[in-house]
């Protein structure tokens, strides 16, 4: 009887992909990046093994927010002090720190455990077009083909 072949972390070949976020919706970009980080686009995907690839996201400042999300949707965090609830609109977050906005969105789509944290560390987001990963020879990935 044949058993299903399971991936081992030592046998996995990791690629580097670069994704241009210009005029791409935040949710669609995050879903595609999370899929690649988890390794769900590979035939040897195993849920308990980190078999995903490295992803570089450039031009995060040119991401598109649809509808009225820029003014009506908020990112909340609390300082654990009374009255310490902070709210920042997505429009402000896009203007001040677009890298954090993409990271928050992708992190919410990954598992909330140690494996999810390992997968999250393989994502590199840059607000502009310049990045420091030219030595890895990243393969350009068209986001519209993934969606």
From Swiss-Prot:
The gene for this chain is rplM
- State the source organism's domain of life: Bacteria
Q: How does it assemble?
A: Part of the 50S ribosomal subunit.
A GO-annotated cellular component: cytosolic large ribosomal subunit
Stored CDD domains: Ribosomal_L13
Which taxonomic lineage does the organism of this UniProt entry have?
A: Bacteria, Bacillati, Bacillota, Bacilli, Lactobacillales
Species in which this protein is naturally found: Lactobacillus acidophilus (strain ATCC 700396 / NCK56 / N2 / NCFM)
Which family does the record claim for this protein?
Answer: Belongs to the universal ribosomal protein uL13 family.
BP-aspect Gene Ontology terms: negative regulation of translation; translation
Which GO molecular function entries does the Swiss-Prot or TrEMBL record give? mRNA binding; structural constituent of ribosome
Pfam annotation, one family: Ribosomal_L13
Q: What is this protein called?
A: Large ribosomal subunit protein uL13
Q: Which UniProt keywords apply?
A: Ribonucleoprotein, Ribosomal protein
Tell me, in a sentence or two, what this protein's role is: This protein is one of the early assembly proteins of the 50S ribosomal subunit, although it is not seen to bind rRNA by itself. It is important during the early stages of 50S assembly.
